[in-house]
Amino acid sequence: MKNEINAVLENMTTTIPEPEDYTGEDGLLYCGKCRKPKEAYFAPDKAAIFGRDRHPAECDCQRTAREEREAAEKRRRHLDTVEELKRRGFTDPTMRDWTFENDNGRNPQTGLARRYVEHWEDMRTDNIGCLFWGGVGTGKSYLAGCIANALMEKEIPVRMTNFALILNDLAASFEGRNEYISRLCRYPLLILDDFGMERGTEYGLEQVFNVIDSRYRSGKPLIVTTNLTLDDLHNPEDTAHSRIYDRLLSRCVPVRFTGDNFRQETAKRKMESMKKLITD
């Protein structure tokens, strides 16, 4: 044991010189590259404890190398964290590509989505969500995905899913409905995509209400995308829909999406490219 302790002390107090290093006028070892000391003297009381008068010190070269290693390790940990958040947060791998960097810049609501991310802490504190509504293919889901990706890059957990998947998960869940819904509500931001497209059975509507109501009571923001119109939401067909829409509208700011159908444009471009390849 004594030998092991001595070995540790030796390692702590001994500097291994490089070929270009040299001894300065003060008797300390200096780096041959940056000309800064690689050693420093102990205070007299510490020297008596360690049985030697000096200990290793960082020269500029060593400090730079250490900072670069630490920065690389920090980047690696960040990338690992973001990867895990996206693995858990997205239900479709293509959602990873829905980013502001990949945006074509034509959607007039892109600025609003960016500001939501920039002011996330305020949105979170004040429990401000969004209801993206409008026609098919107008970019609602894409911009919701942009918000999700941007927040995950900041290491903020987000879950983006839809009620078709939620209902399937609830039907197959072994952990119980309450625990599943509680897990959804633990995310700082929950995004429900394509709201209103799920089957309108009594069971389905009850589960939709349970999720919306639980999120409502959690005090955490919710973003919803839907093809329903604002008129549909303000004039529900029955009580079951009314209590769902009421909670949505009380927590989510309606944002209208208009303009061209981007999916149709993409399909048209692909068709034209295919025709060109075939006819050439």
Regions found by a protein language model. Give the residues of each.
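A short, basic N-terminal segment
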Residues: M1-N104, A267-D280
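Pre-Walker A (pre-P-loop) alpha-helix and adjacent loop at the N terminus of AAA/AAA+ ATPase modules
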Residues: R88-F90, T94-C130
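Short glycine-rich substrate-engagement loop in P-loop NTPases that contacts/grips substrate
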Residues: P108-V117, A148-L189, R199-E206
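Walker A/P-loop nucleotide-binding motif
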Residues: R124-A144
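Residue-level preference for the first positions of well-ordered beta-strands
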Residues: N127-L131, V158, L189, P221
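Walker B catalytic acidic pair
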Residues: D194-F195
